[in-house]
């Protein structure tokens, strides 16, 4: 059973070959940058530059290599919406973490 079939089977209230695995298919099932870098280290992979899903929450999008390694069944779509389309220009790297300053100057 492939990922698509697995998910559709589960959504149809039938039993798939295994429980579908979602990691970062949405912001709510995402992984923070710190946890992701720790995961990469645990798997013996090199650190990666973060690809942000939600900067304010420090949620990153895992690389396809990691998603395949972990056999994740889902892939997320993260369009830049009106609330976060300019978020990258408001980021500063302060060494061990990123700082986000919103339009009111709050971090």
Question: Residue ranges of each PLM-predicted region?
Answer:
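Catalytic cores of TIM-barrel enzymes
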Residues: 1-107
């Amino acid at each position: 059973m492939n990922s698509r079939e697995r998910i559709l089977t589960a959504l149809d209230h039938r039993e798939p070959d295994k429980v579908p695995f979602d990691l970062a298919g949405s912001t709510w099932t995402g992984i923070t940058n710190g946890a992701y870098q720790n995961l990469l280290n645990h798997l013996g992979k090199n650190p990666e530059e973060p690809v942000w899903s939600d900067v304010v929450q420090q949620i990153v999008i895992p690389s396809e290599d990691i998603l395949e390694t972990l056999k994740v069944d889902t892939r997320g779509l993260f369009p830049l919406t009106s609330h976060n389309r300019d978020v990258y220009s408001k980021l500063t790297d302060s060494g061990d973490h990123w700082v986000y300053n919103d339009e009111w100057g709050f971090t």
